[in-house]
């Protein structure tokens, strides 16, 4: 499937969809889960792990976002986590958050192509390009979102806050196996995550220790069980 590109209007400015209404999922539509977070936090590795665990029990597809390449989609194809036609890519050509929050047209077009190409999809994972702590998905694009940070950034990351850390439906603190090497205190990260997120869930994982991403997998399965209105 060829990559989709972020479009612009006649003035050369990106189309604006920041005010797009929240998506209302209807029966028969796939659940859309956004996976965002900084560069190198482990988003693609997490998506790959989820695909490996879920591909035999449901119908799923993946949509990746990169600025100038299709590197993340290519990685998933090389590792055969799904058939090639179930992996699509958007090339944003600019700040990654633009394509998942401000102008979601290219992502919506790619999702339409995935849905049209498969009789019934249960789940679409939408991975953002690597960005900073301010990146979030438009509620018109995804139903729920995961935000991934990693221990290598230091135990200060959760208390820095930001929309992704604070308001995502699930915060994933990845690469816990690196904590001793970088001097990060996991208890501090747990405390600060609880403080900034309140009752919103978070999990600490290491894909090295648990390649199945067990706690995230459990959360995704729980989202799939939520009744669809309609």
Curated annotation (Swiss-Prot):
Residues 14-25 have a biased composition (Basic residues). The keyword Chaperone applies. GTP binds at residues 37-44. Residues 1-31 are annotated as: Disordered. GO terms for biological process: urea catabolic process. Keywords: Chaperone, Cytoplasm, GTP-binding, Nickel insertion, Nucleotide-binding. One of its GO terms (molecular function) is GTP binding. One of its GO terms (cellular component) is cytoplasm. Transmembrane segments: none annotated. It is found in: Cytoplasm. Coiled coil: none annotated. CDD domains: UreG. NCBIfam families: ureG (TIGR00101). Homodimer. UreD, UreF and UreG form a complex that acts as a GTP-hydrolysis-dependent molecular chaperone, activating the urease apoprotein by helping to assemble the nickel containing metallocenter of UreC. The UreE protein probably delivers the nickel. Belongs to the SIMIBI class G3E GTPase family. UreG subfamily. Facilitates the functional incorporation of the urease nickel metallocenter. This process requires GTP hydrolysis, probably effectuated by UreG. This is Urease accessory protein UreG. It comes from Mycobacterium sp. (strain KMS). The gene is ureG.
């Amino acid at each position: 499937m060829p990559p989709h590109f972020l479009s612009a209007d006649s003035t050369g400015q990106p189309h604006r969809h920041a005010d797009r209404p929240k998506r209302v999922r209807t029966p028969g539509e796939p659940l859309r889960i956004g996976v965002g977070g900084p560069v190198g936090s482990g988003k693609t590795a997490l998506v790959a792990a989820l695909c490996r665990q879920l591909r035999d029990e449901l119908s799923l597809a993946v949509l990746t976002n990169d600025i100038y390449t299709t590197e993340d989609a290519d990685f998933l194809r090389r590792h055969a986590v799904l058939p090639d036609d179930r992996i699509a890519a958007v090339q944003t050509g600019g700040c990654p958050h633009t394509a998942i929050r401000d102008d979601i047209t290219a992502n919506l077009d790619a999702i339409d192509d995935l849905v049209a190409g498969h009789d019934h999809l249960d789940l679409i994972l939408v991975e953002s390009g690597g960005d900073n702590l301010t990146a979030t998905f438009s509620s018109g694009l995804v139903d729920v979102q995961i935000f991934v940070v990693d221990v290598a950034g230091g135990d200060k990351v959760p208390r820095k806050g930001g929309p992704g850390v604070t308001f995502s439906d699930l915060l994933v603190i990845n690469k816990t196996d690196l904590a001793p090497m970088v001097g990060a205190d996991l208890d501090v990260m747990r405390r600060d995550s609880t403080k900034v997120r309140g009752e919103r869930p978070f999990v600490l994982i290491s894909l090295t220790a648990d390649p199945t991403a067990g706690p995230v997998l459990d959360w995704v399965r729980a989202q799939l069980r939520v009744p669809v209105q309609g």
